């Protein structure tokens, strides 16, 4: 489930402008050589994170998913949940609604309040927010934390769906990591943009035409 076409197109342009999305030849975590690379860690300034949070908020609103709060898995999800909560608070469609957020620590604290959870108590319908889904480990841990607190995972909200089949080349899964998460936990995965939106840019903008064939070939081999 992606955001509206205009939101997705604007986000792809924004990611390119920030150097977060690049074309070339990159060895990615799976070991594959990818013709594009998306590194959300390069959204690392107040302005860029503020704009990013606006895209997350819009994608969540566009999705129509009912939710009560946000959860950011440590570590990358922490600033994403925080900033998106701020963006939602200022969004006209929220009619002044104030959305709580929480996140977890990797290690339990043995002083003060203790425990691994920080922020608002986990309750109601909770949206897990992260940058991408690679293996689904972070989502699994988040779902366990949310359910253990008596709350309900409502959706996973990510920046980019790579639309890529999981597994080694000689045993490719018929599904992507995003599809596996949706099937395993019975919740939607909402993305701001996807590989399909990147392909649309490559097809529509002549300045990126040189990368079109490589990305299309990669999608044909690994895509879902």
UniProtKB/Swiss-Prot annotation:
User: Which HAMAP family does the record match to this protein?
Assistant: PyrE
Which family is it part of?
Belongs to the purine/pyrimidine phosphoribosyltransferase family. PyrE subfamily.
User: What GO cellular component is one of the record's annotations?
Assistant: cytoplasm
Lineage at the top is: Bacteria, Pseudomonadati, Pseudomonadota, Betaproteobacteria, Burkholderiales
What is this protein's record name? Orotate phosphoribosyltransferase
Q: In which pathway does it act?
A: Pyrimidine metabolism; UMP biosynthesis via de novo pathway; UMP from orotate: step 1/2
Q: Gene3D superfamilies recorded for this chain? A: 3.40.50.2020
Q: Which residues bind 5-phospho-alpha-D-ribose 1-diphosphate?
A: 29, 75-76, 105-106, 109, 111, 130-138
Which Gene Ontology BP annotations are present? 'de novo' pyrimidine nucleobase biosynthetic process; 'de novo' UMP biosynthetic process; pyrimidine ribonucleoside biosynthetic process
Reaction catalysed by this chain?
orotidine 5'-phosphate + diphosphate = orotate + 5-phospho-alpha-D-ribose 1-diphosphate
- Per UniProt, orotate binds at 37-38, 134, 162
The leader peptide range reads none
**Keyword field:** Glycosyltransferase, Magnesium, Pyrimidine biosynthesis, Transferase
- InterPro entries recorded: OPRT (IPR023031), Or_phspho_trans_dom (IPR004467), PRibTrfase_dom (IPR000836), PRTase-like (IPR029057)
Q: How does it assemble?
A: Homodimer.
Protein origin, superkingdom: Bacteria
Please give one Gene Ontology molecular function term for this protein. Answer: magnesium ion binding
Question: So where does this one cross the membrane?
Answer: none
- Has keyword Transferase? yes
What is the primary gene name for this protein? pyrE
Q: Which cofactor does it need?
A: Mg(2+)
User: What Pfam families has UniProt attached to this entry?
Assistant: Pribosyltran (PF00156)
EC numbers on record: 2.4.2.10
Function, as annotated, reads: Catalyzes the transfer of a ribosyl phosphate group from 5-phosphoribose 1-diphosphate to orotate, leading to the formation of orotidine monophosphate (OMP).
Keyword Magnesium recorded: yes
């Amino acid at each position: 489930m992606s955001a509206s076409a205009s939101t997705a197109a604007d986000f792809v342009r924004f990611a390119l402008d920030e150097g977060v999305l690049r074309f070339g030849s990159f060895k990615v975590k799976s070991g594959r050589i990818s013709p594009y690379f998306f590194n959300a860690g390069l959204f690392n300034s107040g302005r860029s994170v503020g704009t990013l949070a606006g895209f997350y908020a819009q994608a969540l609103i566009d999705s129509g998913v009912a939710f009560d709060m946000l959860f950011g898995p440590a570590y990358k999800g922490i600033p994403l949940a925080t900033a998106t909560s701020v963006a939602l608070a200022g969004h006209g469609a929220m009619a002044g609604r104030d959305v709580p957020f929480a996140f977890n620590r990797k290690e339990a604290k043995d002083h003060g309040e203790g425990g691994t959870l920080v922020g608002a108590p986990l309750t109601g319908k909770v949206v897990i927010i992260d940058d991408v889904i690679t293996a689904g480990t972070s989502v699994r841990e988040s779902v366990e934390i949310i359910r253990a607190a008596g709350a309900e995972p409502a959706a996973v909200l990510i920046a980019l769906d790579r639309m890529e089949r999981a597994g080694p080349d000689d045993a490719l899964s018929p599904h992507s990591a995003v599809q596996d998460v949706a099937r395993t936990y019975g919740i939607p995965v909402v993305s701001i943009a996807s590989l399909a939106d990147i392909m649309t840019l490559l097809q529509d903008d002549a300045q990126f035409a040189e990368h079109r064939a490589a990305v299309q070939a990669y999608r044909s081999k690994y895509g879902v």
